[in-house]
Amino acid sequence: MPESPALVVFYGGTGDSPVERTVDDARLSAALDAAEAAREGGIDRAIFVTDQSDLAVDLAGVAVDISAEPFHFGRRLADVVRRRQLDAVIYAGAGSVPLFAADDFREVASRLARGVIVTNNSFSSDLVAFPANEPALAAVERVERDNALARALSEAGLPVDELARTVTTQMDIDSPSDLLVLGLTGEGGPRLREHLAGLPPDTALYARTLPLFTDRASQIVVAGRVGSHSWAYLERETACRVRLFAEERGMEADGRAEAGAARSLLGFFLESVGLDRFFETLSELGDAAFIDTRVLLGHKRIAASRQDRFLSDLGEPDAISEPFLRDFTRSALAAPLPVLLGGHSLMSGGLMALNEHAWALSEQGA
């Protein structure tokens, strides 16, 4: 049985634009909080793997592993594990599970010690704990993206145990929409909360959606990579009706977007009726809409830059260089209902966090 797992955090692929730096700094803040929480949970060794030559981490038990070599996720992870002679690993991308506390890491380590691989999402993983044996590492080496890691280990015949789908296990920091959710709800570790407190983004649009979650007469539209667990959560935990368009789950892990194979019913409808009618129709279907723009971009085979995607999430169309995304974002802002734009995390942990915050405010009479 594996013992003494090490927390291995990957922090790289950072951008140069202000909006990218804002998200990347938040990811690093969350990763530092995670390392501290893991240590409190009995995991006394952490390794930050990065391509940032100037990254310095002043936390007890944390080492920094820097490489400027061409990046391949699986080979890099397996190399770190072998070179540092790790017995077991809790892998997390920087910004993953920003709500994890000491007890959460303790639970992961306990399950791992029983001989099973542990993940927050078998289909698209952000956190994976695994024994550092050769069968596992052979599977790890073949993985190109971290969100395919749990599935690759399962397909190699190794037992995988999935954590319960909760806000804590599903919240992730991938884009500015996640920062807006966390800024509104006030959740996260101390470094992340301090970082969010210094940001200018306006959460008013997100706040407008909160009363809908607790109102039986309201309806929200959710469109994008929504898994069955998220759908079940929304049906079970919200008072409002939910109109769901679930499309292209696993699009990134399977490489369908990159290959130009993603297809979206909403995308076909948008192409048929145009932007104005598209958003008019949304207002006839619900009182607010949550849209995973990455699915629409994949459908249209548009490789929008990370900067442009983030600017769209923030509702800043004038700075977006990609024409479709600029026009779509501008139309979303002018729509007759609140339209929240984001990526996969908004469709899962983000919606969960907003709903739970809405109920907390409702119970307080706010």
Give the residues covered by each predicted segment.
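N-terminal nucleotide-binding beta1-loop-alpha1 segment
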Residues: 1-17
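Acidic donor-binding segment of Leloir-type glycosyltransferases
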Residues: 44-65
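Catalytic core and acceptor-binding pocket of nucleotide-sugar-dependent glycosyltransferases
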Residues: 141-203, 318-323
